[in-house]
Amino acid sequence: MTETTDSVPEPPSDADQLQPKVSICGLDMPAEVSETAAEAAIGVSEPKKRSALWEFAILAVIAIGLYYVMLTFVARPYLIPSESMEPTLHGCSGCVGDRIMVDKITYRFSSPQPGDVIVFKGPPSWNTMYKSIRSNNIVLRSVQNALSFVGFVPPDENDLVKRVIAVGGQTVQCRSDTGLTVNGKPLKEPYLRPVTMNADLSFSPCLGSEFGPVTVPQGRLWVMGDNRIHSADSRYHCNSTDVVNGLSCTGDPNSGTVPVSNVIGKARVVVWPPSRWGGVGSVNSQQGQ
């Protein structure tokens, strides 16, 4: 009779018993193997993290670049700083004024027209009262200038908003018996609000001193605020030779007019506050002349 014996597994050696083990997915593995696996996992995750950071940096640069292109060539926001364009645009010193979007594309293919509401850089003679918005601290000022370059801080310039009344070659003037005229024809200005100005147009059609006639030089614009009594516009900045006679702006027209090259863009829409959302209309006051 043949005698059979079951195979008996050999007992673990002392070295196996002393070697630390770690359970991974329900399997006991030597600690050395687990450490190697962990190091391999870390080695894979670090390149992924670096890749994600690199992608984020690229996207951030692209976003800033697109924003810069938009501000430079397409459109830019602008804060209305004063009440000179009320009721069309609201603003005042120390309050939350309208924020508008300025279209910078239109005037690359056309010229400003009568009735357009434009944002422009004030000519040198208009900047005597301008106060820089930059810090006196040289370091902070450098940071502001850098942020301004990419559009996160407004440029340090005297940007103004007014309505175009007359363009190059046209003659503008105002008399108490005719009111405001261009080329001798009265204007229709529905954007003027006597209540806003607290004035009676029938009693004071010029809403200030009589002026002109002024023939606007080619390549320049005559601009005025919708809130005439509270607007330092072309009338205010035009040198006068007849002040003693109650007239203004009969001297050098270059002093009161604005170069077309100074125009930043056309006011298109009020984007803030929400209660004021809406378009900024161009009303040609010369229409029908």
UniProtKB/Swiss-Prot annotation:
CDD domains assigned: S26_SPase_I (cd06530)
Bilayer-spanning residue ranges: 54-74
Stretches assigned to the Extracellular side: 75-289
Enzyme Commission (EC) number: 3.4.21.89
Keyword match Plastid: no
Keyword Hydrolase included in the entry's annotation: yes
GO molecular function: serine-type endopeptidase activity
Membrane topology recorded in Swiss-Prot or TrEMBL: Single-pass type II membrane protein
Location of the protein in the cell: Cell membrane
Active site residues per record: 84, 162
Topological region Cytoplasmic: 1-53
BP GO annotations: signal peptide processing
InterPro entries the UniProt entry points to: LexA/Signal_pep-like_sf (IPR036286), Pept_S26A_signal_pept_1 (IPR000223), Pept_S26A_signal_pept_1_CS (IPR019758), Pept_S26A_signal_pept_1_Ser-AS (IPR019756), Peptidase_S26 (IPR019533)
Coiled coil region boundaries: none
First-listed, main subcellular location of the protein, grouped into a coarse class: membrane
Keyword annotations of the record: Cell membrane, Hydrolase, Membrane, Protease, Transmembrane, Transmembrane helix
Annotated catalysed reactions: Cleavage of hydrophobic, N-terminal signal or leader sequences from secreted and periplasmic proteins
Gene Ontology CC annotation, any one: plasma membrane
Family: Belongs to the peptidase S26 family.
Matches recorded under PANTHER family: CHLOROPLAST PROCESSING PEPTIDASE (PTHR43390:SF1), SIGNAL PEPTIDASE I (PTHR43390)
UniProt protein name: Probable signal peptidase I
